[in-house]
Amino acid sequence: MGNVARRWLPLALIAAVTALTAYVIRDLPNPVAIDLRGLLPFSLEPAADTAPRWVAIVAMPALATVVWILFAALRSRLALGLTRRLYGDMPEALGNPVTVTRFRPTYDTIVLWVVTLVLGIHTGVVAAALGHVTLAPRIISVVLGMSLVAMGNVFPRLRPNLVAGIRTRRTLADPLLWRSTHRIMGVALVLAGLMTVLVGLVAPSFGLPTAIISLLVTCVIAAVGGSRSAVTSRA
């Protein structure tokens, strides 16, 4: 996929999903009833909620648009400069947008899948509104898992920057630690995503908890494994 196409694909997806949503729920009563009981392995109270039809159509696509705009703003010189101040005595070069531009295709891929995740949640909510109570958690879990796999696949390509990745003072100051941490994080994210997809298909109510727990474990594995790998490489 070309860089320009990848850059604008999130907005095209948002527009397409919004239009499709407006079409498929046009005949539903207003307000729309949304039942997400199958999303978790325990019961939610109330069992179902309602929302105005226009909210069901535009709320999550609007959030996806805000996410896309935020990612675009975060790589600006102003945002990077302000972020660098939060880290104290980090190199001034990290405030340069070039630090993001050099892995721009990877950055755009991550943005695309974050937007896809938001739209996947939206699709699950729409499915619940249409009465597909058991399908909704499967959609959300599968899209969440696929997003983790896709982002994990490109995570090792990230380079030290202030926008994307595991950005601590240690990883930003040590290129070797950055590489080892993100290599391990990428593998762990792929495994977490595959597990989330599998659980989401077989036992959909456990898909979201599986994703949350596996993400926490992934962060621990990346932090510990990355540090040990960096030490071993220096030995």
Predicted regions and their residues:
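Select subsegments of transmembrane alpha-helices in polytopic membrane proteins
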Residues: 6-14, 67-73, 105-117, 179-190
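Alpha-helical transmembrane segments and their membrane-interface junctions
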Residues: 19, 116-137, 191-210
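Active-site and channel-lining beta-strand-loop segments
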Residues: 23-58, 164-173
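Membrane-water interface of transmembrane alpha-helices
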Residues: 24-27, 65-90, 150-166, 225-232
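Alpha-helical transmembrane segments
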Residues: 49-68, 134-151, 213-214
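Ordered, amphipathic secondary-structure segments that act as subunit-interaction surfaces
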Residues: 70-136
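Membrane-proximal helix-loop-helix units in multi-pass membrane proteins
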Residues: 125-147, 154-171
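Terminal transmembrane helical module of multi-pass membrane proteins
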Residues: 162-235
